[in-house]
């Protein structure tokens, strides 16, 4: 085989080109899929000797033809291969001239004669988008969804004289998600994996390893092609059947019904998993029950009483509208264009004219699709407008919803003016009458400024730890949801208003958000109490109060982030100036724990936003609700779409995807050390993203005999029992000097007996429930281990006998350095006390530092010299002297050793979300 020099150079480092067998291929087909298969086959070193595709349409070549022509590959564009049942001689001769060893048909709409199919040495292989023998025929993907199949996939098979009946070479499958459409299934799996499989199949043939597995007749089905005339909805079926029919026809040919005498097509169907919202009835011919036009879309009902939601409607003239606007679709007034807007309209008219090259004049009545445009042209139109109109962001659906030029210009102008933004954010709430108020709780993913269901419709229950009941079901973010959220954050940073906003205006938004949080502090604190078990009075002061303070503090930093000038050696006789700039990183990910759901959000996101970044935040799976309420407030504060995205779900799915995502430039994490290590590894392997980790702790608190004992008892209890012990800096081990040890323990037990354990919404409650059942069970096991190892259980150690996840405040003494209790964090209301000899300062310091953790620490003594000596020697990110838990928004917070690195709070936190650029100029 002869290779051009450029080919050899291009593949020099890719040994697979030289050490694998390669074939001469004829590619027969069309479309972007065909183009990608063609390109990948070339990269693998195969030689495409000819491309056989469809003729140009309206002067535009198919993507496969364009790619091949650009490479100099022979391209043949035949309108047909046969005439009156016989192969056209000229076509056959042209095909034979290329000398192919294998025909590859990635996507082909033409009938290819069998003499062509069988002509090459290795025959022909075809891609088919179903798991053959199921769904033979041209509408295979549609029928996969229409029939409610749980598995979808594709087959690469050897062509024979039957209809999709040839032997199987390979197959790949995937799960069908509840709300998959033809497009989502194709884009997620059939397109990308299909390309890989076609290339793999060709290589298997080249290596002589390709199987030929006969198709079984058992389970074989053949369905006809779906066209508009046979896509009408049949209403006598369950909601799931209606949903499958609609999504199986989305976008082509489109499932439809007759409404008010005209054909209306449904798009964007999803099954309703919550209660049916209120709306205005809409009669639909043939439907047993009227639909409901709601603020979220059109609700349709199956014969089983269950419901589905349709997002968009399309009328006979091609115009598409949000289904929620059905009764107001014709009420929009025409806007008068300014001189500047007229210039934009002329620019867009030129773009339309280029795309619709066969349309002599573009007029207001010119319809984009009726003038010959296809779905590919929609993408081109959106991209050309973005490039030519100052980065104006349109969506593909904007074109479908305004197909005539005049309507399209009106939509563009409204977008430029901000008039097409929703007047009121659409939020589905779960409402609770609790704590003397009506609490409204969002429960969906918050992506790109909208509350939306998870793409696959999955939800999970979030539980009230006070009584173990379900508060509501929350959207469970999938990988696709994470990707959408990251894309929104990336776009908002690179192309949106946020990236162009003045720093002072950014600060103004953050101040406004802090004010809204303060105005809604009672509701936020109530949600925090319901979802995390936080005592309401503590939630008001700390969980919510410090969150408000954090946003105000960092709002003030927005316009004070600055670089410096640096004197360097001059390039004499010229001069140099060197300065640094601090710049945001881009789209950041934040993963927070469950102990302070809103405060942990604030600690990280406020600094991230002040630095100018955008973010995707994953709250803890068990405590997502205050984060979602916070998302609602960000919209009310005026934050642009995509700046803040909240995705509830699991760490194993959503969290892992964020740590691996190539478009995330920084990840801030608070959680366990073991998970932190995995995150750091994923961040390094993916794209070496910047990381800050606030991890586990076993914070020592040393209490000397010369302390203020009353204060030491009070604050020592707070160091352990504050927030039910679910506190990252909780004193994990108390070292009490021998002279006061017994009295200290006695006083602590006396004070514990005064504590009221109960409903966190009761204003007199001191100690609420543990966050969730699994954590409570872990704490009980922790206590059991302590007893088994010989520690003395002085008080508690049991679950409180009442509904919910309540645990008694617990005290252990006699804890030796080798014991499990001395080494491992409980993260609960368990005081672990060890005695140390009188006057043995260095000895107790050695014991206190004998841990891999280094988050916080404390010392109580009246001797300032002793206090300062101890603070110097303690290996921890924070040292408290004669106090504990005294954090402040202006004081940097973070650990060392295996408690992590990086800082929250204070000016230092900003540096976690900034990069420094050095600029040197000569003059």
Curated annotation (Swiss-Prot):
Q: Where is this region: Hydrolase domain?
A: 23-331
Where, subcellularly, is it found?
Mitochondrion
- List the catalytic activities from the record: (6R)-10-formyltetrahydrofolate + NADP(+) + H2O = (6S)-5,6,7,8-tetrahydrofolate + CO2 + NADPH + H(+)
Pfam families found in the cross-reference section: Aldedh (PF00171), Formyl_trans_C (PF02911), Formyl_trans_N (PF00551), PP-binding (PF00550)
Q: O-(pantetheine 4'-phosphoryl)serine modification sites?
A: 375
Ranges for the Carrier domain?
339-416
Q: Which domain of life is it from?
A: Eukaryota
State where (6R)-10-formyltetrahydrofolate binds. Answer: 110-112, 164
Transit peptide positions? 1-19
Q: InterPro entries under this entry?
A: 10_FTHF_DH, ACP-like_sf, Ald_DH/histidinol_DH, Ald_DH_C, Ald_DH_CS_CYS, Ald_DH_CS_GLU, Ald_DH_N, Aldehyde_DH_dom
Q: Which family does it belong to?
A: In the N-terminal section; belongs to the GART family. In the C-terminal section; belongs to the aldehyde dehydrogenase family. ALDH1L subfamily.
Write down what this protein is called: Mitochondrial 10-formyltetrahydrofolate dehydrogenase
Q: Which organism is it from?
A: Mus musculus
Q: Write the lineage as a comma-separated list.
A: Eukaryota, Metazoa, Chordata, Craniata, Vertebrata
């Amino acid at each position: 085989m002869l290779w051009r020099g450029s080919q050899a150079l291009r593949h020099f480092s890719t040994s697979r080109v030289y050490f694998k067998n390669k074939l001469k291929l004829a590619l027969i087909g069309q479309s972007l899929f065909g183009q990608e298969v063609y390109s990948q086959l070339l990269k693998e070193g195969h030689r495409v000797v000819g491309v056989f595709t469809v003729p140009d349409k309206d002067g535009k070549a198919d993507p496969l033809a364009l790619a091949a022509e650009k490479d100099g590959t022979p391209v043949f564009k035949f309108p047909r291969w046969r005439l009156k049942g016989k192969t056209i001689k000229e076509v056959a001769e042209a095909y034979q001239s290329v000398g192919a060893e294998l025909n590859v048909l990635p996507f082909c709409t033409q009938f290819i004669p069998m003499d062509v199919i069988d002509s090459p040495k290795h025959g022909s292989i075809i891609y088919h988008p179903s798991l053959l023998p199921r769904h033979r025929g041209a509408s295979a993907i549609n029928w996969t969804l229409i029939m409610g199949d749980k598995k979808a996939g594709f087959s690469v098979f050897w062509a024979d004289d039957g209809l999709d009946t040839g032997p199987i070479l390979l197959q790949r499958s995937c799960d069908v998600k509840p709300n998959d459409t033809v497009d989502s299934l194709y884009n997620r799996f059939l397109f990308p994996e299909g390309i890989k499989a076609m290339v793999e199949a060709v290589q298997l043939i080249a290596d002589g390893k390709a199987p030929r597995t006969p198709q079984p007749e058992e389970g074989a089905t053949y369905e006809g092609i779906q066209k508009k005339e046979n896509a009408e909805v049949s209403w006598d079926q369950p909601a799931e059947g209606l949903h499958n029919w609609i999504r199986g026809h989305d976008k082509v040919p489109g499932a439809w019904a007759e409404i008010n005498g005209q054909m209306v097509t449904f798009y964007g169907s999803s099954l309703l998993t919550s209660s049916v919202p209120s709306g205005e009835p809409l009669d639909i011919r043939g439907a047993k029950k009227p639909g409901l036009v709601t603020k979220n879309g059109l609700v349709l009902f199956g014969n089983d009483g269950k419901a589905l939601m349709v997002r968009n409607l399309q009328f006979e003239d091609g115009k598409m509208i949000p289904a929620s606007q059905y009764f107001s679709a014709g009420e929009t007034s025409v806007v008068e264009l300014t001189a500047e807007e007229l210039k934009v309209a002329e620019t867009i008219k030129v773009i339309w004219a280029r795309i619709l090259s066969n349309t002599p004049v573009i007029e207001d009545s010119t319809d984009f699709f009726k003038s010959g445009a296809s779905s590919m042209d929609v993408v081109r139109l959106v991209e050309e407008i973005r490039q030519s109109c100052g980065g104006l962001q349109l969506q593909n659906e904007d074109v479908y919803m305004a197909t005539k030029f005049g309507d399209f210009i009106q939509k563009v102008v409204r977008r430029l003016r901000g008039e097409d933004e929703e007047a009121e954010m659409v939020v589905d709430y779960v409402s609770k009458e609790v704590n003397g108020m009506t609490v409204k709780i969002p429960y969906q993913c918050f992506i790109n400024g909208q509350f939306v269901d998870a793409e696959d419709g999955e939800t999970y229950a979030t539980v009230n730890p006070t009584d173990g009941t379900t508060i509501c079901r929350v959207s469970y973010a999938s990988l696709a949801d994470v990707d959408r959220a990251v894309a929104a954050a990336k776009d908002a940073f690179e192309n949106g208003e946020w990236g162009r906003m003045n720093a002072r205006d950014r600060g103004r938004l953050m101040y406004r958000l802090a004010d809204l949080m303060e105005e809604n502090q009672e509701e936020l604190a109530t949600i925090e109490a319901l979802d995390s078990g936080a005592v309401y009075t503590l939630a008001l002061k700390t969980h919510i109060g410090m969150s408000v303070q954090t946003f105000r503090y960092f709002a003030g930093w927005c316009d004070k982030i600055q670089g410096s000038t640096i004197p360097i050696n001059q390039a004499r006789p010229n001069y140099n100036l060197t300065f640094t700039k601090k710049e945001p990183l881009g789209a950041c990910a934040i993963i927070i724990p469950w102990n302070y759901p809103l405060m942990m959000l604030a600690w990280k996101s406020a600094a991230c936003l002040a630095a100018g970044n955008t973010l995707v935040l994953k709250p803890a799976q068990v405590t997502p609700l205050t984060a979602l309420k916070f998302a609602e407030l960000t919209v009310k504060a005026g934050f642009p779409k995509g700046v803040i995205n909240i995705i509830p779900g699991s760490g194993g799915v959503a969290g892992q995807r964020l740590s691996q995502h190539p478009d995330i430039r920084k990840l801030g994490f608070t959680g366990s050390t073991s998970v932190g290590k995995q995150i750091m590894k994923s961040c390094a392997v993916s794209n070496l993203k910047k990381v800050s980790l606030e991890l586990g702790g076993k914070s020592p608190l040393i209490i000397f005999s010369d302390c203020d004992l009353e204060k030491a008892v009070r604050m020592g209890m707070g160091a352990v029992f504050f927030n039910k012990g679910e506190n990252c800096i909780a004193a994990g081990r108390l070292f009490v000097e021998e002279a006061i040890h017994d009295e200290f323990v006695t006083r602590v037990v006396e004070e514990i007996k005064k504590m009221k354990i109960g409903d966190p919404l009761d204003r007199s409650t001191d100690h609420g429930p543990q966050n969730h059942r699994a954590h409570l069970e872990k704490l009980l096991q922790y206590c059991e281990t302590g007893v088994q190892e010989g520690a003395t259980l002085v008080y508690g150690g049991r679950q409180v006998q009442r509904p919910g996840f309540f645990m008694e405040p617990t005290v252990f003494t006699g804890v030796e350095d080798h014991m499990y209790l001395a080494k491992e964090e409980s993260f609960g209301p368990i005081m672990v006390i060890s005695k140390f000899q009188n006057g043995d300062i260095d000895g107790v310091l050695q014991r206190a530092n004998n841990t891999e953790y280094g988050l916080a620490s404390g010392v109580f003594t009246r001797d300032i010299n002793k206090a300062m000596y101890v603070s110097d020697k303690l290996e921890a990110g924070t040292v408290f002297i004669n106090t504990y838990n005294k954090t402040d928004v202006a004081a940097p917070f973070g650990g060392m050793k295996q408690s992590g690195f990086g800082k929250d709070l204070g000016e230092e936190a900003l540096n976690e979300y900034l990069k420094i650029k050095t600029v040197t100029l000569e003059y």
